[in-house]
């Protein structure tokens, strides 16, 4: 009998294939997205140094106070704007977008649009 592979396992495989091809450097770090059922997280990562330069999520107090629900596109857009603003404050203007194996649609797209509106280039 065949065993069904979970969607999350497939996503992790897609993410691993992409991660083999892209890395974040200090000049152009990687904007990584993680999506859970209730929250969304974004990090700007320098893979060469192995450090997270900037992070934002729907768990931040600045976003929690602005939204009623944290698992929707409005909250994701606010996270994108916040991570973009924090990255620009740290001197990061261009990034490589790592969608984390998720389809570029819905919350992931809203986060990317918010980061672009904040001034990040990718």
Curated annotation (Swiss-Prot):
Location of region: Disordered: 1-22
Basic residues bias (residue ranges): 1-20
One of the record's GO molecular function terms: 5S rRNA binding
Keyword Ribosomal protein: yes
Disulphide bridges, residue numbers: none
Alphabetical GO biological process terms: translation
Keyword Ribosomal protein: yes
Keywords, in A-Z order: Ribonucleoprotein, Ribosomal protein, RNA-binding, rRNA-binding
GO CC, one annotated term: cytosolic large ribosomal subunit
InterPro entries: Ribosomal_uL18_bac-type (IPR004389), Ribosomal_uL18_bac/euk (IPR005484)
Function noted in UniProt: This is one of the proteins that bind and probably mediate the attachment of the 5S RNA into the large ribosomal subunit, where it forms part of the central protuberance.
Similarity-based family: Belongs to the universal ribosomal protein uL18 family.
Record's subunit section: Part of the 50S ribosomal subunit; part of the 5S rRNA/L5/L18/L25 subcomplex. Contacts the 5S and 23S rRNAs.
PANTHER family recorded: 39S RIBOSOMAL PROTEIN L18, MITOCHONDRIAL, LARGE RIBOSOMAL SUBUNIT PROTEIN UL18M
Descriptive protein name: Large ribosomal subunit protein uL18
Taxonomic placement: Bacteria, Bacillati, Bacillota, Clostridia, Peptostreptococcales
